[in-house]
């Protein structure tokens, strides 16, 4: 690929969603404009998933690439035009007749994703067992939740080197090997079935009355109906599964384990595993992001996994050497004074300009290294020139004082004089 083609491809990536409004910042954001390497909006600093960007096709390409060269190729289809694998997302449309005064109207509900099972009644049951605010009904809060989780749990830059910022050939090779490894050893998709169906097939199921690793005996005809109802328990919450309710199985975990639909969550972030896509490691379920975090350091600047042997650690976070930069101006911070603002490093000039509190005495910004006095939302330089009685100008450092909004007084008398 020549340089011109590469630049065109990069430009198109940065044009995607350009100008889309931020759902979080509203009118405070001028519209989405992707930062060159941070994966956030340059205007409001929110992620692309917080903006009203139509990403369904792009997300389907991302998940399609994830399933490529795995046993889940039945969930993808390759476009004839470019051969790019596309996720065959299962969309479920339910129609319910609604009685009206004169005739019967049809109420249609579209789920942007549903479990790919032949039994639609089972898929409907699955959806009803999810919290309402997480059901991916088109145009709803749940659909927006799914969109955010697709972006958060399965970042494209965790599997596609072309989505990363200036990787070396060695880093590209290491990343490709890493992706190949997690596809073969950890990646999976949950399967929705009735526990009784698995029992009838002779599969092992988890028995809450025994050890977690001890499968329940199946096919015993002398069990009472009550015993059958308490035969299955959720691997996550340990509560009993109700008879007739669907359960989720994860093949990599073994079919002796099952989960309630609302309990099929990442063990790190606690969020529903989007589209039941999971990663299994050491007896735990992970989303894609947190599985990768358990294997590789992640740069707090660009959000990419670090495949270089050389990187820096600061403020309990990892950073590419080139990405340990001021969050406001992008200047490299190595060897410079910086201040953490909402867990982001900011250089001293930007801190003073954009974030520093203003002294109530001199009305100038307070430098980060300078001592200050703070009361409620008001601050002063801790100096004899600034922290003074608002009436008589007596220095109040180390003294008792009476605060009144942005003023301080040394005595009741001074306060009365200014009333």
Swiss-Prot record:
Q: How does it assemble?
A: Interacts via LIM domain 1 with ZYX. Interacts (via LIM domain 3) with ENAH and VASP. Interacts with ALKBH4, talin, actin, alpha-actinin, GRIP1 and PXN. Interacts (via LIM domain 2) with ACTL7A (via N-terminus). Heterodimer with ACTL7A; the heterodimer interacts with ENAH to form a heterotrimer.
Q: Which GO terms describe its cellular component?
A: cytoplasm; focal adhesion; protein-containing complex
Stated family: Belongs to the prickle / espinas / testin family.
- The segment(s) forming the PET domain are 92-199
Organism (species)? Rattus norvegicus (Rat)
Q: Which Gene3D superfamilies match?
A: Cysteine Rich Protein
Can you name this protein?
A: Testin
Main localisation: cytoplasm
């Amino acid at each position: 690929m020549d340089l011109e083609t590469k630049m065109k491809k990069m430009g198109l990536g940065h044009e995607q969603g350009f100008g889309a409004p931020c759902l979080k910042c509203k009118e405070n954001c001028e519209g989405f404009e992707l930062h060159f390497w941070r994966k956030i909006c340059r205007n409001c600093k929110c992620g692309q998933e917080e903006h009203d960007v139509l990403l369904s096709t792009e997300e389907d390409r991302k998940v399609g690439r994830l399933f490529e060269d795995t046993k889940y190729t039945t969930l993808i289809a390759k476009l004839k035009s470019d051969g790019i694998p596309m996720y065959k997302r299962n969309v479920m449309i339910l129609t319910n007749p609604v009685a009206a005064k004169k005739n019967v109207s049809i109420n249609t509900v579209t789920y942007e994703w549903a479990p790919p099972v032949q039994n639609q009644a089972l898929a409907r049951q699955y959806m009803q067992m999810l919290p309402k605010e997480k059901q991916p009904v088109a145009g709803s809060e749940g659909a927006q939740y799914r969109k955010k989780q697709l972006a958060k749990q399965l970042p494209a830059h965790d599997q596609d080197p072309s989505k990363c910022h200036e990787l070396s050939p060695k880093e590209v090779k290491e990343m490709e090997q890493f992706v190949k490894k997690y596809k073969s050893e950890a990646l999976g998709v949950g399967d929705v079935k009735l526990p009784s169906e698995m029992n009838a097939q002779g599969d092992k199921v988890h028995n809450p009355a025994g050890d977690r690793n001890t499968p329940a005996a199946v096919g015993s005809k002398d069990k009472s109906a009550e015993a059958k109802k308490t035969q299955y328990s959720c691997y996550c919450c340990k509560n009993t599964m109700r008879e007739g309710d669907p359960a989720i199985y994860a093949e990599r975990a073994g079919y002796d384990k099952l989960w309630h639909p609302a309990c099929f969550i990442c063990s790190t972030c606690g969020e529903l595993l989007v589209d039941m896509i999971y990663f299994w490691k050491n007896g735990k379920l992970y989303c894609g992001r947190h599985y990768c975090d358990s294997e590789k350091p992640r740069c707090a600047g660009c959000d990419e996994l670090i495949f270089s042997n050389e990187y820096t650690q600061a403020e309990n976070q990892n950073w590419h050497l080139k990405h340990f930069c001021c969050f406001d101006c992008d200047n490299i911070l190595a060897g410079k004074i910086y201040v953490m603002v909402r867990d982001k490093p900011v250089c001293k000039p930007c801190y003073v300009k954009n974030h520093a509190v203003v002294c109530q005495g001199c009305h100038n910004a307070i430098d980060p290294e300078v001592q200050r006095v703070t009361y409620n939302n008001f601050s002063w330089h801790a100096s004899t020139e600034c922290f003074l009685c608002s009436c008589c100008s007596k220095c109040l450092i180390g003294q008792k004082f009476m605060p009144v909004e942005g003023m301080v007084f040394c005595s009741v008398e001074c306060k009365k004089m200014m009333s």
